[in-house]
């Protein structure tokens, strides 16, 4: 396997119990990284973390956390620091594939999506950037989608929220580059995962096909 030069790097991944988050955590642990995972379902998260521990024989920290809650975000970072002493990489991966036409998206849908995908990233970046600034190194990776740059019809509120995340990424990248901190977004395409599978299973019903 190719070497990503990640041995003993501490990587915090939100939305780490399923899909791309879990797959990334497993690969990074295989590369020797010390991984901290968070998810809302504590027992399920622990099961998935145990899979990674057993397969990689590496230290994996699982922390139950709802990233839409500011206090829980603070606790997530504090527990990671307490266990691993630092954070080298933050992966803001939490999110859903919410997609509907404009007339079907309620105020609550907008608020929930922005809180989950954008404000969670804002809060966690705010918490980890001082740590990275102090040691003059670090990396933040924000999950996004191509629809954040070129949205399709019926892609709300996700496309708007991800567009904001892409803008946040570029803003932070410009601001914190002098501190040797890299901030990047990955525009993810269709990947076979639980959220995508659910979307495709329910799409015919949504479209009344």
Predicted segments, located by residue:
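Conserved glycine-rich cofactor-binding loop
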Residues: 17-18
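Substrate-binding pocket helix/loop in short-chain dehydrogenase/reductase
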Residues: 101-102, 106-114, 196
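Active-site loop-to-helix junction immediately N-terminal to the catalytic Tyr of the SDR YXXXK motif
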Residues: 105, 151-160, 171, 195
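Active-site helix of classical SDR
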Residues: 125, 161, 169
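Alpha-helical segment proximal to the catalytic Tyr-Lys
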Residues: 130, 174-178
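Residue(s) in the substrate-gating loop at a strand-loop-helix junction
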Residues: 145
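Conserved small/polar residues in nucleotide/adenosyl-binding loops
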Residues: 199-205
């Amino acid at each position: 396997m190719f070497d990503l030069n990640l041995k003993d790097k501490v990587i915090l991944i939100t939305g780490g119990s399923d899909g791309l988050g879990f797959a990334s955590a497993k690969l990074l642990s295989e590369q020797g990284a010390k991984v901290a995972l968070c998810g809302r379902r504590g027992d399920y998260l622990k099961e998935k973390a145990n899979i990674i521990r057993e397969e990689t024989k590496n230290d994996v920290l699982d922390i139950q956390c709802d990233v839409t809650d500011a206090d829980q975000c603070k606790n997530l970072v504090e527990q990671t620091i307490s266990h691993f002493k630092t954070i080298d990489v933050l992966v803001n991966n939490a999110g859903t594939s919410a997609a509907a036409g404009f007339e079907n998206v309620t105020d609550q849908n907008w608020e929930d999506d922005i809180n989950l995908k954008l404000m969670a990233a804002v809060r966690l970046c705010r918490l980890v950037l001082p740590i990275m600034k102090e040691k003059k190194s670090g990396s933040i990776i924000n999950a996004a989608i191509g629809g954040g740059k070129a949205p399709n019809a019926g892609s709300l509120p996700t496309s708007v929220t991800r567009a904001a995340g892409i803008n946040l990424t570029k803003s932070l990248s410009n601001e914190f580059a002098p501190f040797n901190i890299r901030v990047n977004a990955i525009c993810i395409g269709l990947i076979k995962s639980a959220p995508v599978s659910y979307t495709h299973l329910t799409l015919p019903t949504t479209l009344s096909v």
